Amino acid sequence: MGERLRRHGAACVMDEVAAADSEALILVDEADREVGHLSKTECHDGQGVLHRAFSLLIFNNEGELLLQQRSRQKRLWPMYWSNSCCSHPRRAENMETAIHRRLYEELGLRCPLHFLFKFQYQAQFESAGSEQELCSVFIGRSNAAVKVDSNEIHALRWAHPEALQAELAGSGADKFTPWFKLEWARVWREHRAAVLALQ
């Protein structure tokens, strides 16, 4: 299949404290208007409560996408492969500040980030809870060394988009988070030119 998937072997580990479950997330309506705040734990209980989130897709100079395998300590989708970084703005924090803050906290990276689109989804993970997010998707490019927050990430790998498409079209799709599969399908379908322009 000509896969160029490979584990990221040069990452060094940073022992940063993972986002507290009591941290207040921003509740929104379907138009992304702020309607209140609720703890991270409560947002993920049951069917979930709609809240503001973001997803970052980081590519290298070869056009490969950085994928992370979520920590086994995660309440939702532990050990699943997902996008480069995803999180939530803090209470009273704007999106621009939040995306750059979290990219550095989780991966030790700083790079320009470009907005692509927003999408809303709801997904339940067994009996552990659910995600229900209005998620803004951004892309960026970096060839810098990655510094991993081991509380958030179990492993990293770089994937060429063509190989990733093949993996997602097969039985390997079950190893990926639901939000990543949704957003990547749209990136591949509607925003491939923007990804290629990063190279």
Predicted segments with their positions:
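Nudix hydrolase/Nudix homology domain
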Residues: R4-G9, E42, M79, R91, ...
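Acidic, metal-coordinating catalytic segment for phosphate/diphosphate chemistry
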Residues: D15-S55, F59-N61
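A glycine-rich, hydrophobic loop/mini-helix early in the fold
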Residues: A53-H88
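The catalytic Nudix box helix
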Residues: L66-L67, S82-L116, F138
